[in-house]
Design a protein with these regions (language model features):
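Juxtamembrane intracellular "pre-TM" segments in multi-pass secondary transporters
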Residues: 8-20, 191-228
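Helix-loop boundary and gating motifs at the non-cytosolic
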Residues: 13-66, 217-255
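Hydrophobic core of transmembrane alpha-helices in multi-pass small-molecule transporters
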Residues: 31, 100, 110-128, 225, ...
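Conserved MFS/SLC helix-loop-helix module at the cytosolic interface between two early adjacent transmembrane helices
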Residues: 71-105
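Structural signature of the two symmetry-related core transmembrane helices
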Residues: 88-102, 281-296
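Symmetry-related core transmembrane helices of the 12-TM Major Facilitator Superfamily/SLC fold
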Residues: 175-192
Length: 297
């Protein structure tokens, strides 16, 4: 029996022999990808501030990274669909991120940094959506088990944030680009184990506009837009805000980790909550808690 040939085909939960290897390969990507994000989100704005970038410049740099999400995932998704080489898109995106970010420690000026972040995030945003597709194709009908794999991303984020809070306190915030490079390297290595996934879904031929104007789709898009809009200042300036209010990097790491710990608890329970409460109700509740979160901050 050739296990490697079929490792990402069908439903891994129906194949106990292949479960461990598939689970490890999928989970390791999420772990290292979000560990990279754990190094980036809380500490990159602090690093930019340390390098004497202004609040305006930090906002533009952070906004550039988020802005590429509008175009990059759609373009890379189209390439993956046309070529059928989704795993190669993931690997190419991860390697490109690593190579581009190698220049980050040498950049001191605003415009070169914006340019670097633009190209970095253009490839960064290529990997995760395509890997999500690989994961869902691997799970097949057991898509409700997705959270058990995805929670490893949250664990990676927490460990990264907490470990770097210690190292930045000891060695200074200037080590952050090198820490990000380390996690980007591990992310790329994890993509080398991604195999070509068999897409068992049958796509219906519909125009994009026809799909978007559906009330349910339009409602989700508007809700997600507003949620992302509310997170923009948080991602860019929250760590700086805490620093200016005399919080240590150790405490900043703990504060960032608290939200992700809650995320892990949700991932552990969500597969049983969906059939019990319904997606719509869970969606509404999550927005209520998000609103409460901003009010408390």
């Amino acid at each position: 029996m050739n296990k490697d040939k079929n490792i990402y085909k069908g439903n891994i939960l129906d194949a106990p022999i292949m479960l461990d290897r598939s689970y490890i390969h999928l989970s390791s990507f999420y772990f290292f990808y979000f560990a990279s994000l754990g190094a980036f989100l809380p500490y990159w704005p602090l690093y930019l501030s340390y390098k004497s970038f202004t609040a305006y410049e930090i906002g533009i740099i952070t906004g550039t990274m988020i802005g590429t999400k509008i175009i990059a995932p759609n373009l890379w998704g189209w390439i993956a669909d046309k070529t059928g080489l989704r795993h190669r898109v993931i690997q190419f995106g991860a390697l490109s991120c690593l190579l581009i970010f190698m220049f980050a420690p040498q950049i001191e000026n605003f415009y070169p940094m914006v340019l670097l972040i633009f190209f970095f995030s253009f490839f960064w945003n290529a990997s995760l959506p395509q890997f999500e597709a690989v994961t869902m194709n691997t799970l097949g009908s057991s898509y409700n088990k997705y959270s058990q794999i995805r929670l490893w991303g949250s664990l990676g984020f927490i460990l990264s944030v907490l470990i770097l809070s210690f190292f930045t306190s000891k060695y200074g915030i200037n080590i952050i680009p090198y820490c990000i490079l380390f996690f980007l390297f591990l992310t790329w290595v994890s993509t080398l184990y991604v195999k070509k996934a068999e897409d068992n879904t049958k796509a219906e031929s519909s125009s994009l506009l026809t799909i978007i104007i559906k009330p349910a789709v339009l409602g989700i898009l508007i809700s997600c837009f507003l949620m992302q809009l509310s997170h923009g200042p948080f991602y860019a300036f929250f760590a700086i805000y805490l620093t200016e209010n005399s919080y240590s990097t150790n405490l900043i790491g703990v504060i960032w980790s608290l939200g992700v710990i809650a995320e892990i608890l949700i991932f552990m329970k969500i597969s049983s909550w969906i059939p019990k409460y319904g997606l719509k109700n869970l969606f509404i509740i999550s927005f209520l808690f998000a609103t409460l979160r901003w009010l408390l901050i």
